């Protein structure tokens, strides 16, 4: 039997595929903009026949119909990175958050630490050789498919066929659900003056020929805009966005000087506009790989002049970075921040950067704080932080004492909060005992 016959034998409608899920199964579900939406709704429709199905996933772009309150008891969520679709469920205790570095998620599956019976993933249609591309999200999906007993492929004719280490052979698939639905789009934001200032300062740390890790949002967009005069930049990142596409088209990103995968944009997922999804379709410039490769710090470090640009919710005056919670309330997750911070630190000429606005809540709350809020999780330790960038400047923390760090971070805090930060450091005796606020460092 050739692959086409096997593929056709496994075609079924979405309701039949949903019946392959049993009570008490652990089910991996692909996430981000690749969430297999028809299966989510089909599972919701048969919720009354299911009990305690564990759904294991990262964030979903758009709604999660299985996170509704009336789904409790039928489905329970284990979330590896929290997004808006599941944040309320996590904060209310209806879903569980699992802290993990992005590079380690595939190993959770392969090692058997989290056995998976069913994997549900979105793919592009098969190519002429019978391989299904995972399209806009490779991340942990390939590992889940490798270990699952049942693999359900939601084959979306509107999914781009991406290249790299992101293919599933048709014979590995238990069920094929053919469909056509638009991927969620996240168009680029318009950076504010604050974000533009941050972007310009970050860009000053980027040399020609550097390799970048960029995310999505106003800060990375502002960084890319500020890099217009740079030459031969490369990309090794978690995520590809519209701004990466724009920088390729403008000639800023060529990958010509990359020391690992020269000429290639290496990533594990893509998120942006339909124009981006069309751009990466069958484009050999892009190489999509699983997160245990893209986010492996030792792989990242093989890129010389690696510049990692990550954000934070708050940074304390010693350099501890909180990026997953607002106090005790989980907001997002570890993601790949520390993967890239450490990878860039090990890279020859690497530059690990934490970039954030100096304030939140319309300027009423400082994001450079004396201490992280009670319950806040530290994602990047103070021993790992090299640069903290705000619209007020660049704090260089590498090789600095706590006393010196206070000075560096005060200088990039909003002026309205510097005196309070100084007083707190003095009261905690981080600044010298002979020092009193307003005198300067003794």
Go through each PLM region and give its residues.
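Conserved alpha/beta enzyme-core scaffold
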Residues: 1-442
């Amino acid at each position: 039997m050739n692959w086409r016959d096997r593929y056709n034998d496994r075609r079924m409608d979405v309701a039949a595929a949903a019946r392959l899920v049993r009570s008490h199964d652990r089910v991996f579900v692909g996430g981000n903009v690749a969430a297999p939406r028809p299966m989510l709704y089909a599972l919701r429709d048969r919720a009354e026949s299911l009990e305690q199905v564990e759904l294991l996933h990262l964030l979903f772009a758009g709604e999660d119909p299985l996170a509704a309150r009336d789904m409790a008891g039928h489905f329970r969520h284990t979330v590896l990175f929290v997004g808006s679709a599941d944040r309320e469920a996590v904060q209310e205790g209806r879903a569980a958050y699992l802290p993990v570095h992005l590079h380690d998620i595939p190993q959770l599956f392969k090692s058997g630490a989290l056995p998976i019976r069913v994997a549900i993933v979105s793919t592009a249609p098969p190519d002429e050789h019978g391989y299904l591309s995972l399209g806009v999200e490779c991340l942990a999906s390939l590992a889940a498919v490798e270990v699952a007993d049942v693999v359900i492929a939601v084959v979306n004719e509107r999914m781009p066929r991406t290249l790299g280490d992101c293919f599933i052979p048709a014979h590995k698939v238990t069920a094929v659900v053919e469909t056509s639905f638009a991927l969620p789009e996240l168009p680029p934001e318009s950076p504010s003056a604050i974000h533009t200032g941050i972007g310009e300062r970050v860009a000053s740390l980027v040399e020609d020929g550097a390799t970048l890790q960029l995310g999505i949002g106003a800060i990375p967009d502002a960084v890319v805009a500020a890099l217009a005069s740079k030459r031969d930049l490369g990309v090794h990142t978690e995520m590809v966005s519209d701004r990466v596409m724009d920088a390729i088209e403008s000639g800023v990103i060529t990958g010509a000087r990359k020391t690992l995968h020269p000429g290639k944009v290496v990533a594990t997922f893509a998120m942006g506009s339909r124009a981006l999804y069309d751009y990466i379709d069958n484009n050999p410039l892009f190489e999509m790989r699983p997160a245990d490769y893209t986010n492996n710090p030792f792989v990242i470090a093989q890129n010389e002049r690696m510049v990692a640009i990550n954000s934070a919710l708050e940074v304390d005056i010693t350099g501890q970075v909180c990026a997953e919670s607002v106090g005790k309330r989980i907001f997002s997750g570890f993601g790949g921040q520390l993967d890239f911070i450490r990878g860039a630190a090990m890279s020859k000429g690497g530059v690990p950067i934490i970039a954030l606005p100096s304030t939140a809540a319309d300027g009423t709350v400082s994001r450079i704080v004396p201490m992280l809020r009670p319950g806040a999780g530290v994602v990047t330790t103070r021993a790992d932080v090299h640069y903290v960038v705000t619209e007020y400047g660049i704090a260089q923390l590498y090789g600095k004492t706590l006393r010196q760090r206070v000075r560096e971070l005060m200088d990039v805090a909003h002026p309205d909060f510097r005196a309070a930060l100084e007083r707190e450091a003095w009261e905690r005796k981080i600044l010298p005992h002979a020092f009193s606020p307003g005198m300067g460092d003794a």
